[in-house]
């Protein structure tokens, strides 16, 4: 059987190249060769924090644009040679959770997240995609692969944070954390019609992109509690929506304190470090302050990717601003991942161009 090479989590705290048998293509599936890849902080959590437990020789990665190398006999909408956007989340669309409107949670909590979780990820010379007609999107001719790869997870997750926050025309919004996902939440808030947008962060390159994406105010968490700064800036009114895209467990307390009655706190941040999320009882009205909490996992699937791609085509978003480091050659995946782990101050997102 044919072999292929991929960059893998060999075990907790160890990564390396592995050789495996080429995955089989099911009747409704596809085999993809990557054109553009991007490491994610989730890959770092997986390997060096044990976020999903131990894995042996599991190929990493879930952000990809590629070219169709093989299709199953029942695939109708794609052919060999098509360039496609691959969502990070590839649900089982016939599952009960998908039919209830929660495709990211198919077969169980976070079950739509298959790449580098339940099966090998996209950092391989080839990789498998289930239900190709529902989980692939054609790459528009005028969109570059390295631009589109920012849609797989970053924009899909960040904009979900804004969608879940119930932002209305003129809403005042706070986005806590302006790494790549938080920056996409800023862009999402602006596209949904927010008025004033507070962006909480300090790194100059991220602050610059936050302003480009629509932030009206920058809050420096080093200058004091962010809830106090935002309450002062809003004459003690607070905000209509809070999107948590960074920070720590204390961030939740600050989010509740800055939230108005009727607001939504929308979380897109991976929670680590403690089993219990603390909420300030009094500020939350003893649990009765009409401050809701919304959570979600990156939306996936074909329609999601097509709609995000249309935002690029018609000038609503500019994902290229997220890309600070470019690598050429598939073998540079390792360098890109280690850059993500080291997190230099000038980094937002790295991209690997595989050709």
Give the location of each predicted region.
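C-terminal hydrophobic helical "lid"/dimerization subdomain
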Residues: 1-4, 253-256, 301-355
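Glycine-rich beta-strand-centered segment in the early N-terminal region that forms part
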Residues: 23-37, 50-99, 120, 140-142
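N-terminal Rossmann-like NAD(P) cofactor-binding module of classical short-chain dehydrogenase/reductase
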Residues: 85, 240-243
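Mid-domain Rossmann-like dinucleotide-binding core that forms the NAD(H)/NADP(H) cofactor-binding site
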Residues: 84, 138-223, 228
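NAD(P)H dinucleotide-binding glycine-rich loop of Rossmann-like/cofactor-binding domains
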Residues: 92-176
